[in-house]
Amino acid sequence: MSIPETQKAIIFYESNGKLEHKDIPVPKPKPNELLINVKYSGVCHTDLHAWHGDWPLPTKLPLVGGHEGAGVVVGMGENVKGWKIGDYAGIKWLNGSCMACEYCELGNESNCPHADLSGYTHDGSFQEYATADAVQAAHIPQGTDLAEVAPILCAGITVYKALKSANLRAGHWAAISGAAGGLGSLAVQYAKAMGYRVLGIDGGPGKEELFTSLGGEVFIDFTKEKDIVSAVVKATNGGAHGIINVSVSEAAIEASTRYCRANGTVVLVGLPAGAKCSSDVFNHVVKSISIVGSYVGNRADTREALDFFARGLVKSPIKVVGLSSLPEIYEKMEKGQIAGRYVVDTSK
């Protein structure tokens, strides 16, 4: 298979710098890496943070962002096992980990102190060819629609793991804060497929229609409802058993601690820059609620999340545009104008 020397990519050279669509060299895989011809990449809110550089963790610069890349293996290092040329492969947020520390030993690779992050510390999937650690790269079944599966590689895995972290049972209420966004639209479907009753909170044109089309049961529009807490408690007859906070609103996170049912779980997923999670201690203790953080997922979570997709239980509500349109997508994202998930075609 012929591999070119150069490729098209979106790259920036400083935080908040110009997003340049230009030719850059095709990377060479290290002994433990795959070289993947990225066909499509999802666009995540994390990519926006990587560009802004507003998280405590510094990015590499210059940087090619993106961490939801779906494509075809076209090359590999000499130490790679379990892959062959032509396999479908996915690039995840966790590009690689040491596999030797206590966290990796327990399957918590995302907490590895030496984790390498796609589109953050490792050039990501907003390019035609990208490298990924062969151990952490996702195995995608042949014949899968690579555009539709792309968002599963971060958004899908992330919300699936978060729902597992909520310790819910069939028939329990799962509240999704930010239910019509890229992560939320997938969380609604995973929750439904796992047997939960789903309440969604979001606001803006088309959000309720999308939520309902995905199988959600109760929708609360925060732009119209004056008392979100009371509305959730009433709709769920006592509060949600589990809340998945994919919204990037500090106020929404605080509210979720108040509409959580007694003995319920608040799961923090979205990462608004500089935000804090505030919970009234008396209410927290007397209601015996748990607040947990959930950060992407491990290889088993990846396999399980992809299986839901492969069986048709979860679909990606996507809009495909060219990679060159990435600056416009970021602008829409900053204005909260995105329903579902944008996916970029790296060839355009």
Swiss-Prot record:
Induction: Repressed by glucose and expressed during anaerobic fermentation. Preferentially oxidative, glucose-repressed isozyme that catalyzes the conversion of ethanol to acetaldehyde. Main enzyme involved in ethanol consumption. Acts on a variety of primary unbranched aliphatic alcohols. Also produces ethanol from glucose, albeit less than ADH1. This is Alcohol dehydrogenase 2. It is an enzyme of class 1 (oxidoreductase). The gene is ADH2. It comes from the Eukaryota. Pfam families: ADH_N, ADH_zinc_N. It is found in: Cytoplasm. It comes from Saccharomyces cerevisiae (strain ATCC 204508 / S288c). CDD domains: CAD3 (cd08297). Zn(2+) 2 binds at C98, C101, C104, C112. Homotetramer. The modification N-acetylserine is found at S2. Its cofactor is Zn(2+). Keywords: Acetylation, Cytoplasm, Isopeptide bond, Metal-binding, NAD, Oxidoreductase, Phosphoprotein, Ubl conjugation, Zinc. PROSITE patterns: ADH_ZINC.
